[in-house]
Regions:
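Helix-start (N-cap) detector for alpha-helical repeat units in TPR-like alpha-solenoids
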Residues: 21-22, 54-55, 88-90, 123-124, ...
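Register position in tetratricopeptide repeats
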Residues: 33-34, 66-69, 101-102, 135-136, ...
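Conserved structural position within tetratricopeptide repeats
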Residues: 45-49, 78-83, 113-117, 148-154, ...
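Short coil turns that delineate tetratricopeptide repeat
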Residues: 51-52, 85-86, 120, 154-157, ...
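Canonical tetratricopeptide repeat
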Residues: 59, 93-94, 128, 165, ...
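Terminal, low-structured helical/coil segments at or just beyond the last alpha-helical repeat
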Residues: 192, 196-250
Length: 250
């Protein structure tokens, strides 16, 4: 009789702890949705003190990233991976992004490879690996990953940035025509979504257009730049007919 009561009491404590953890995780999720990241971290901590949970550890890491607690975020992503090592693609991806951000490129590549092994259709992971490959000078591999990401993503709020990153990889291969085409797609994407086109964006597009003998296109792109920058370009590119009119327009 006493043994049965003891078992029931223990079971009740376990259930209560699980319910409390779930409540804390739910509060953490709500705080995350409202952008209250430090509050979310507190709730996740309370829940994780009672039980391990992949999603809670992952979200805690993301919240810590948001408030620039990078070392703590890395530990949380590691906890998430430990809680679900065979199904942790997002934890591997975020830890890879963190490694890339902090300059730990080799470890970032290992993690993003694991993320893509578990989820081959993760567009953000494909994009990250493409950027890493570009940084390492493996331009063909970068383009392959970015091609896959673009094919999966289609037209969306991030597709333009995939074109931009692929343009950088094409530049590494000295394929300036493909780079020009991607850069044009990127700027078209920015304008379509009412996003700012920077001086650097126009400069890069103009350089690529000039590299493939599209002087008129380069002229149009560079006209959006400040007068001082246009003067520098005019001195660099020489005295072709188009550039003569470009200088006259300054």
């Amino acid at each position: 009789m006493y043994k049965q009561i003891f078992v029931i009491l223990i079971f009740g404590c376990v259930v209560a702890a699980g319910c409390n953890s779930t409540r804390m995780f739910s509060r953490g999720d709500k705080s995350m949705q409202n952008g209250r990241y430090e509050e979310a971290i507190t709730y996740y901590d309370k829940g994780l003190n009672r039980s391990d949970n992949y999603e809670a550890s992952l979200n805690k890491g993301i919240a810590q990233w948001k408030v620039r607690e990078y070392s703590n975020a890395e530990n949380s992503f590691a906890d998430a991976i430990k809680a679900s090592p065979e199904n942790a693609p997002l934890a591997y991806y975020y830890r890879a992004e963190l490694g890339f951000k902090t300059g730990n490129i080799d470890e970032a590549l290992k993690d993003v490879n694991k993320a893509l092994y578990q989820d081959p259709l993760n567009v953000q992971a494909l994009n990250l690996r493409g950027r890493i490959c570009t940084l390492q000078g493996r331009y063909a591999a970068a383009i392959e990953d970015l091609n896959a990401a673009i094919a999966i993503e289609g037209e969306s709020r991030i597709s333009g940035y995939l074109y931009h990153n692929r343009a950088i990889a094409y530049i590494g291969k000295d394929d300036f025509k493909s780079a020009r085409d991607d850069c044009e797609l990127f700027i078209r994407f920015l304008r379509k979504n009412n996003l700012p086109v920077t001086v650097e964006d126009n400069y890069l597009l103009g350089v690529l257009q000039y590299a493939v003998d599209d002087e008129d296109g380069a002229l149009t792109s560079w006209q959006h730049m400040p007068t001082e920058e246009k003067a520098k370009i005019g001195r660099i590119v020489g005295n072709s007919n188009s550039m003569y009119h470009f200088k006259e327009a300054q």
